[in-house]
């Protein structure tokens, strides 16, 4: 079975399962989907698409990778974050082919508007120390966002992976500058990747 055909088959099965089990609430980057609609700049449709795409891409890719593991004894690790239909891919896989496959799965989503593939080709497991450091770094960054006047922290998604902090959100240029400055000067942050979408305020 070809990779493309396999991906489509798995995606259909995942969607069917999701439909049978109902919607599952998720918390990504510290903001509950559906719980902050009053201040969320995403439409309700985009919020729903984000949740469904994260689940479907992760399940489809993980199922294929585990069935076609290129490195014996190595379990691929994937994280999928979708914000306003912009998809961020993180994790570790064994080969470039596997990395490209995950990206193909993400780009096959009809609602996806952009895909950022930061998956690493590194067939070795992350250590507990790596995970703890990333978690602590994300927590510190989220805390610093509370001190930015005029910026609502729940409009900013923060994800740290292997020492790199990824920042997403629908923000004005002024908000983007303030958030970037705050994140990049937070103690312990090694590298910052900004994936903003620009919000234009109506006159």
Model-predicted segments: where are they?
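N-terminal targeting leaders
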Residues: 2-6, 15, 22-203
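Short, intrinsically disordered, charge-biased short linear motifs at domain edges
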Residues: 9
